[in-house]
C-alpha cells in the first residue's frame, strides 16, 4: 500500500537559551493510508515535534516531507509551499490536542462551525465557492451526530465533561473532511473510562471514514487499544518501529520493553511473587517459568505436551490471553518440576517451538 505520509531523514533544530537543541534527529517514518499509527515516547522524546512537521506547524531543519504523493518540504531542493496553498493543505489534516482549545464563548455547534468559516467546495463548473449557511448547518449537524453530541449542540464548553469537550474537538477537526487526523496526547487529560470511550470513537471514525490516524502518546495502553503500527522515540530519534503485533511479540529496544511492561498484568503478578507465602521457596528440582505465546501457538497444547514428552510436572500459577489486532497473545507463569535433564529438554522444546520464555528462578520471600 502507498504511504500517505513520508517523513524522510527529518531533523529539527532550534536555539534555546543560547544553545542549539536537536529535537528530532534523522527520523524516517512512512505511514500508509488507513493506518492508525502510534508514536510513543516519554516527555521530551521529540514525538510531538516530529508529528507537527506533517502539516508544517513545525518546519524541519533538514530532510524531506511527502504527503499524499506531494512534496511539501525538501531541504535539498526547496519547495514553495506558503500562503493559500499551505492553508488549503492544512485543512486536509485535522488535529486534536490534550487541552481541547474550544472557544468558551461559543456553543458546541458554533465551535464546530468555526472550522468551516473559510471552507470552500467546487461547484458543478469546477469553480471554488464558500459554503452557504445551510450547507454549514447541515455539515455541523452531521458531525455532531457522528460524535454523539447532537443533543448538546446549544451547550457551552463550561457545561461539558472532559470527554464531551474532546468529542467537540474531534468534530471540529473533521469539519473539512481531512484524510489525516493527528491526535497529540488527545486522551492524556482524561480518566481511564473516558479515554477508552474516546479511543472507541476514533476507531469507529477510522472505520466509517477511512481516515488515517496518527496518535502521539506516552501511554502504551493507548497504543495497544487502537494502533496497528508503532514507532518508539527516545532523545529525538526513532529507535524502533514495527507493526503492533511484532512490537509486542518481539520488542528489541529496552525502552520498548519498558513500555510494554506497563500494560502487562503478568509483570505485576511476577513482582508480587516475592511476597507470596505459597512460593516462598521452590524445591531443588523446580523452576519458575514465564512463558509468552501468540497466534497459532495458543491452539497447541504446549504444557500438556511437555508433561507427556519429558517426564516433568507443571503447576500453573498465572494465565492470561488477550487480543491485539484480532490476534491472541497469552502469558503463563508455571513451575516446571523434574530432573535437570528433563527440565532442560522441556525448555529446549520451547525454543524449538519458537516460544518466548524466561526462567524466573527461585522466589525468595521478602520482608517489608
Swiss-Prot record:
Q: Which residues cross the membrane?
A: none
Protein name, per record: Methionine import ATP-binding protein MetN
Query: Function, please?
Result: Part of the ABC transporter complex MetNIQ involved in methionine import. Responsible for energy coupling to the transport system.
Look up and give the membrane topology term: Peripheral membrane protein
Superkingdom classification of source = Bacteria
Query: Any one cellular component term from GO for this entry?
Result: plasma membrane
The Gene Ontology terms for molecular function here are: ABC-type D-methionine transporter activity; ATP binding; ATP hydrolysis activity
Residues that bind ATP = 41-48
Transport found in the keyword field: yes
Q: Which UniProt keywords apply?
A: Amino-acid transport, ATP-binding, Cell membrane, Membrane, Nucleotide-binding, Translocase, Transport
Enzyme nomenclature, EC number: 7.4.2.11
Species of provenance? Lactococcus lactis subsp. lactis (strain IL1403)
User: Where in the numbering of this chain does the ABC transporter domain appear?
Assistant: 5-260
Q: Where in the cell is it found?
A: Cell membrane
Do the record's keywords include Acyltransferase?
A: no
User: What quaternary arrangement does the UniProt entry report?
Assistant: The complex is composed of two ATP-binding proteins (MetN), two transmembrane proteins (MetI) and a solute-binding protein (MetQ).
Recorded catalytic reaction(s): these are:
L-methionine(out) + ATP + H2O = L-methionine(in) + ADP + phosphate + H(+); D-methionine(out) + ATP + H2O = D-methionine(in) + ADP + phosphate + H(+)
Which family does the entry's similarity section mention? Belongs to the ABC transporter superfamily. Methionine importer (TC 3.A.1.24) family.
Amino acid at each position: 500500500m502507498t504511504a500517505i505520509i513520508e517523513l524522510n531523514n527529518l531533523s529539527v533544530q532550534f536555539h534555546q537559551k543560547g544553545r542549539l537543541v536537536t529535537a528530532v534527529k534523522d527520523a524516517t517514518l512512512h505511514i500508509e493510508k488507513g493506518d492508525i499509527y502510534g508514536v510513543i515516547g516519554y516527555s521530551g522524546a521529540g514525538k510531538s515535534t516530529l508529528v507537527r512537521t506533517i502539516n508544517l506547524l513545525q518546519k524541519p531543519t533538514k530532510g524531506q516531507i511527502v504527503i499524499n504523493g506531494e512534496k511539501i518540504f525538501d531541504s535539498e531542493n526547496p519547495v514553495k509551499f506558503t500562503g493559500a496553498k499551505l492553508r488549503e493543505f492544512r485543512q486536509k489534516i485535522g488535529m486534536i490536542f490534550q487541552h481541547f482549545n474550544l472557544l468558551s464563548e461559543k456553543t458546541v455547534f458554533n465551535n464546530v462551525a468555526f472550522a468551516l468559516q473559510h471552507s470552500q467546495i467546487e461547484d458543478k463548473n469546477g469553480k471554488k465557492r464558500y459554503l452557504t449557511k445551510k450547507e454549514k448547518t447541515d455539515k455541523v449537524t452531521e458531525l455532531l451526530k457522528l460524535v454523539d453530541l447532537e443533543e448538546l449542540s446549544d451547550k457551552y464548553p463550561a457545561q461539558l465533561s472532559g470527554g464531551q469537550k474532546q468529542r467537540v474537538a474531534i468534530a471540529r477537526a473533521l469539519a473539512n473532511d481531512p484524510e489525516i487526523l493527528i491526535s497529540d496526547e488527545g486522551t492524556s487529560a482524561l480518566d481511564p473510562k473516558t479515554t477508552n470511550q474516546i479511543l472507541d470513537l476514533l476507531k469507529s471514525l477510522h472505520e466509517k471514514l477511512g481516515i488515517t490516524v496518527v496518535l502521539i502518546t506516552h501511554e502504551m495502553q493507548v497504543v495497544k487499544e487502537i494502533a496497528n503500527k508503532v514507532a518508539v522515540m527516545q532523545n529525538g530519534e526513532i529507535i524502533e518501529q514495527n507493526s503492533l503485533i511484532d512490537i509486542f511479540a518481539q520488542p528489541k529496544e529496552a525502552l520498548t520493553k519498558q513500555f510494554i511492561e506497563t500494560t502487562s498484568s503478568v509483570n505485576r503478578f511476577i513482582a508480587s511473587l516475592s511476597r507470596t507465602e505459597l512460593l516462598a521457596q521452590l524445591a531443588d528440582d523446580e523452576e519458575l517459568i514465564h512463558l509468552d505465546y501468540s497466534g497459532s501457538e495458543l491452539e497447541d497444547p504446549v504444557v500438556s505436551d511437555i508433561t507427556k514428552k519429558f517426564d516433568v510436572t507443571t503447576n500453573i500459577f498465572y494465565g492470561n490471553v488477550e487480543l491485539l489486532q484480532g490476534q491472541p497473545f497469552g502469558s503463563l507463569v508455571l513451575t516446571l518440576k523434574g530432573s535437570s535433564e528433563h527440565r532442560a529438554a522441556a525448555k529446549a522444546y520451547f525454543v524449538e517451538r519458537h516460544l518466548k520464555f524466561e526462567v524466573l528462578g527461585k522466589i525468595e520471600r521478602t520482608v517489608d
